[in-house]
Amino acid sequence: MSDRSARLQALQNALKERILILDGGMGTMIQSYRLEEHDYRGTRFADWPSDVKGNNDLLLLSRPDVIAAIEKAYLDAGADILETNTFNATQISQADYGMESLVYELNVEGARIARQVADAKTLETPDKPRFVAGVLGPTSRTCSISPDVNDPGYRNVTFDELVENYIEATRGLIEGGADLILIETIFDTLNAKAAIFAVQQVFEEDAVELPIMISGTITDASGRTLSGQTTEAFWNSVRHAKPISVGLNCALGAKDLRPYLEELSTKADTHVSAHPNAGLPNAFGEYDETPAEMAAVVEEFAASGFLNIIGGCSGTTPGHIQAIAEAVAKYKPREIPEIAKACRLSGLEPFTIDGQSLFVNVGERTNITGSAKFARLIREENYTEALEVALQQVEAGAQVIDINMDEGMLDSQAAMVRFLNMIAGEPDISRVPIMIDSSKGEVIEAGLKCIQGKGIVNSISMKEGVEQFKHHARLCKRYGAAVVVMAFDEVGQADTAARKKEICKRSYDILVNEVGFPPEDIIFDPNIFAVATGIEEHNNYAVDFIEACAYIRDHLPHALTSGGVSNVSFSFRGNNPVREAIHSVFLFHAISNGLTMGIVNAGLLEI
């Protein structure tokens, strides 16, 4: 067993035994040293062309003694886990100082210094090993929010750029000796999803895997992140990372953090962490909450069973950490709850589909192939009016909206990205999950890079063979999306009940047993075909679909079902009263036999 493996086993053991202590504010302690420009420059950067004071990460290279002393003080105060001083060690953040070329070195040194300090403390107290969390900060840019109020579809950073930044930082942290990766101070969940994607890519490419800690930031009394998500929606969006812990930090003091931490402690099937500020800043931007005051609030968290890991953020000092460590020492760590399997989606708000859920309406009018009005607006690049179509679907009761931009004369990828970016700026629409609908893999992936919530991909299938099917499934899993799986294989679409059952069973086994895809995130579409076509072989299409739904419900545990409801009445196009009547009768029987959701014109159904 390697040293790192032994430490990780010790970490797992410690989490079972007690509430672990994270360190406190690094910036707060650096300020106490009253460092000047020459301290930040040191000898190496004496002639740097721009001011560097305030670039706290640079102290890893110019004043490593200061960083090591602060980290030692936190360990002496009772901390179990040190956070590396790498909060801004990405190319995006270091560009403010023209120091992008130092990023890899900063991450290596950040982890190496913390590793040395932690190992020295472990030698003093072998029965209490210390650990290093390699920090990935949020950067100074947001992938979900436009910095230009006049152009809500504009972004000053892309998902791919963030991934590139985080890959470099992650590799440096691992080389330097980090035990865990901590993605923290998440104010935009899409940034965090990019970090998760990058970290998992490094794990896969470099044949190494460390536990991931995730910590979001509730920015104010609204109980939401800066990008608008609630606590539960945030958790649903990042849960695919299977983190060793999820928590909240920064922006709020412990007292104000309480309701959101309590909610997280009941929803998360992993360890829960918190590192709040020392209260709220005063008029001078300083934090006044004393160690005793903060420890009293945190002790109540521990007594209430909310905590597995606790530390401090802005304004906290070794004094705060010592008081907190002493206050929680007598309490058992929170027990991880058993959370029932369910499809847990999110937009700005959570949306759960389980055995008790009513039929889910997926709004179909934002599909360029199904709405002439929407198609015209997109072709004219009138995205503002196109948003009204989406809003009407949500207001009419759509709990998910299906977005499809597949049209021969359109740049489908650009249209998908633009529309999704604009939706992100409309909370009345973006509160619901998104279904990204395309037959083109590149359009689906471009769409996944735009949504901070947990959405649905529509669709994947075995049409191009099993290996391609598994590739698409793994990619969707990496992005944290649920998937619609069509009853379609190398031979063609399933058109009989027997074929529908056979293909769905085969797809399910491959996804669950070979890809490791969560069964609750699999949504089968057993193909709704038109009836009343005048062709005898088509007469049983609706019944075959309903029979397949019942089979999936009864034989493929936790999987869901969906379908394009308007297909069944296609023979009657132009006769809306007849079509609506057919839809209602069809849905009555399909839902009774297990149909979970349908792509419908929300508001025009009578069930």
Curated annotation (Swiss-Prot):
It catalyses: (6S)-5-methyl-5,6,7,8-tetrahydrofolate + L-homocysteine = (6S)-5,6,7,8-tetrahydrofolate + L-methionine. InterPro entries: Dihydropteroate_synth-like_sf, HCY_dom, HCY_dom_sf, Met_Synthase/Corrinoid, Pterin-binding_dom. L-homocysteine is bound via the zinc atom. Belongs to the vitamin-B12 dependent methionine synthase family. GO terms for molecular function: cobalamin binding; metal ion binding; methionine synthase activity. Zn(2+) binds at residues 250, 313. Binds 1 zinc ion per subunit. It is an enzyme of class 2 (transferase). Residues 359-607 form the Pterin-binding domain. Its cofactor is methylcob(III)alamin; Zn(2+). Catalyzes the transfer of a methyl group from methyl-cobalamin to homocysteine, yielding enzyme-bound cob(I)alamin and methionine. Subsequently, remethylates the cofactor using methyltetrahydrofolate. Modular enzyme with four functionally distinct domains. The isolated Hcy-binding domain catalyzes methyl transfer from free methylcobalamin to homocysteine. The Hcy-binding domain in association with the pterin-binding domain catalyzes the methylation of cob(I)alamin by methyltetrahydrofolate and the methylation of homocysteine. The B12-binding domain binds the cofactor. The AdoMet activation domain binds S-adenosyl-L-methionine. Under aerobic conditions cob(I)alamin can be converted to inactive cob(II)alamin. Keywords: Amino-acid biosynthesis, Cobalamin, Cobalt, Metal-binding, Methionine biosynthesis, Methyltransferase, S-adenosyl-L-methionine, Transferase, Zinc. It comes from Pseudomonas putida. GO terms for biological process: homocysteine metabolic process; methylation; tetrahydrofolate metabolic process. It comes from the Bacteria. This is Methionine synthase. Its EC number is 2.1.1.13. GO terms for cellular component: cytosol. Pathway: Amino-acid biosynthesis; L-methionine biosynthesis via de novo pathway; L-methionine from L-homocysteine (MetH route): step 1/1. Residues 8-328 form the Hcy-binding domain.
